Amino acid sequence: MPKNTGIKFVETKPYKAMTNAIHTNTEIASYDYIIAGAGGAGLSLLHYLMQCSSLVSKSILVIDKSFNKTNDRTWCFWNKDASAFETLVKNRWDTISIHAQGFDKELPTAPFSYKMIQGIDFYNAVLKEAKTKSNIHFQEATITSISVLDSLSTSNAINVNTENSSKNINSKESINKRAKVEWEGGSAMGSYVFSSLLPFQMNQINTAAAYSNSLQAGTSSNNKAPFLWQHFKGRVVQFDAPVFNKAIAKLMDFNVPQQGATAFMYQLPLNEREALVEYTIFSENVLSIAEYDKVLDAYLAKGFPGATYKITHDEIGAIPMTQIELATTQAPIYTIGALGAAIKASTGYAFQFIQEQCKNIVDQLDKGLPIQTKIHNTRHQFYDAVLLHVLFHHKMEGAEIFERIFAKNEAATVFKFLSNTSSFLEDINIMRSLPTHIFLPAAIKVLLRRA
């Protein structure tokens, strides 16, 4: 994209056609909403803004380092009803299976379905709709700072981490606060700024691991707050002959190298010959690419001896599993997605929680309410903290934890628990699946740490 001085306005035309006319203005452009980051969270928020009748005329600026999206991730989730992105669902399953040493179980998921959406389909659908809206503008750039402005003083810092820098931003209390977003060669102001810009890239796992190590550098292992990565490498494999039962999603197969942590294979059949097969690990540090590939090669060779296949797509990533705040903000800047603590800390599940967070934000904007981005209730946050403590301090193998939970409960109950929608009685049934002598001391330590 050519670089011009001044403020850049990309007209609402196909987002890939970034050579559209760019208008230059000597004054800072002002928008009702600025969305910093056009990933899953940023584009989900944009989608719900476009669906809200009272907000459709609001001016919106979406900023991302590139709008040339790739199929960089796969989102899976479960729900009972049609989702906001039901037309994008590539596959769904009504039966899952769990496997561990000496344990194999198939579980019907009714009334839930387990669903898959490919990242590229999601990106393209939202951006295609957005390009038809004259009130939505796009800026392709790397953001260098996000700051709070007010009517009485210049900007101070907010604790917003960008890919290239970490800004510490605290604004003074005053009326008519606005926020300023800056990038090389330009800036814009917004009445609200919603940022999902992480200080690392999820698909560059080495930068992710370096970031988490830097957060608690110098802290003794006993005093570290739990921070694990759900890191993975997956392949879409296509066999020459039918080998998969397309009706069953293999949610967790723990019969793989555990890497001194919690590791499992994730197998989602797209049809009888094709599946996404993903090696997933919960641990403090990530592996080399060769290590993921070695396990994937061995798993496929053992599971499908003599069969031939080709790899049509691969993906790699790291999702933070922690309750450490990745950013602290003040109005009118708000964090969303992983940066805004939307991810469920004990499992890394994100898509449905991001949808809930973004829908809540738009509902608050619609009703003129103060913006609250928190979505995880206190009870389920406590459960997450306890499970994280057990996994982080290796009090019990993750394979045994999940085997016990799925062995003694229906899949629908587990899904409700993992979705933070379970009742207290259902929670008790889940807890009864796990050894008290391990989880009770962990719960006490979590309570003492929070006191």
Residue positions per predicted region:
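Short beta-strand to alpha-helix junction loop
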Residues: 108-128, 283-291
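N-terminal Rossmann-like FAD-binding beta1-loop-alpha1 element of flavoenzymes
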Residues: 31-58
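N-terminal FAD cofactor-binding segment of flavoenzymes
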Residues: 48, 61-102
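Short, conserved active-site loop motifs that form the nucleotide-linked donor/cofactor pocket
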Residues: 135-136, 333
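Extreme N-terminal leader/targeting segments of oxidoreductases
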Residues: 1-32
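Predominantly flavin-linked oxidoreductase catalytic cores and closely associated redox partners
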Residues: 137-164, 171-304
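FAD/FMN-dependent oxidoreductases across multiple families
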Residues: 143, 257-259, 283-360
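C-terminal helical "tail/cap" subdomain of flavin- and related membrane-associated enzymes
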Residues: 359-451
